[in-house]
Amino acid sequence: MISRLNREFALKTEPERRSAYADMLLSPVMHTDCTNARENGKSCQAYVCATPDGKALYFAREKKGHEGVKGTVTEDYQGILVLVHDITFYNYGSDHQECLAHVLRYLKASMENEPDCTWNKKIHALVQEMVHFRNGCRQPHGPDSEIVSGFEKRYREILETARKEYEDIPVNDYYKDGYNLFLRMENTCTTICCSCMISGYLPRIMKPKGF
């Protein structure tokens, strides 16, 4: 009975899902993730694709990696992908940004484990400021480019502070996550600033229910 209802629901929502799929391909930024789930009592991988306008699609797959990505929006997507560490996703999209919720979490860990550093506190506050500003922006075409450039300038200045601090304070052999985070943020500086300003902000991709 339940199985039949699920099948009927899937068939009836197919037009909506196809429409959402097409719309999501046009979004300048899309979040993607993969998490463990269960389908009909069996373990599977749930692939999630979500855009800032509220659209989200879930795909149950037997395998992770490229086999799991097949048939999802991510496979055909050509914009900026916001993701959590999974090197598979770096083969898709035109550019990549680590999920800001995770970045903020890692920065807090850096603040706790590297109390002598100042860059982590400064950039944590800046990212929060950027997110708050963008979420409060009511301009139809997004913030002015000069505002975005201003955020990027401050961002790069803080990263330069980080570089100098790590030159003065050698990386701890027992905690290298802060330094590695700095390197990732330096590599994706423009992407983080631009995507945060253009697309809005989704805190994180929630684990799907009902699998």
Language-model-detected regions and their locations in the chain:
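Catalytic center-proximal scaffold of phosphoryl-transfer enzymes
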Residues: 1-211
